[in-house]
Amino acid sequence: MLTVGDKFPEFELTACVSLEKGQEFETINHKTYEGKWKIVFAWPKDFTFVCPTEIAAFGKLNEEFADRDAQVLGFSGDSEFVHHAWRKDHDDLRDLPFPMMADSRHELMRDLGIEGEDGFAKRAVFIVDQNNEIQFSMVTAGSVGRNPKEVLRVLDALQTDELCPCNWTKGENTLDPVALLAGE
């Protein structure tokens, strides 16, 4: 699995971006959001149980990610048509404010090293900086949903470019190593 310091792979995927007729799909690639932070997360498959809770939670925080100049991008190995059908079918996904990318050939999940032995994407999330370098990566067991608020907290910490202690949140003091070494 790619990790901190690795370049995020190049990709080009079709995404479901809307339920509005004629506006449903867009092509998204590694340059689409160039110069922005990116929150890229994968889920195993559509029409399941844990996945929509995470996707909806990332959607509810989308504005907060956008306020930090970060674009949320989600994907699975399902096609854009399956994503569209799921969005249409699931109340919590209808108005999703970010693209649901279709990695139907499994190229991105393979390049990231998150394709499971079962052929499905592992439940992974990556924070990618403006230079397309991975600054955070996490994967959980398929039965355990991620916490998008924690991903937002880590993004905040990364954007300070300072030392942030355990459980640090935006607005709190960061660590001053000079003062700490001086015993202050």
What are these regions (language model features)?
Residues 1-184:
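Chalcogenol-based redox active-site neighborhoods
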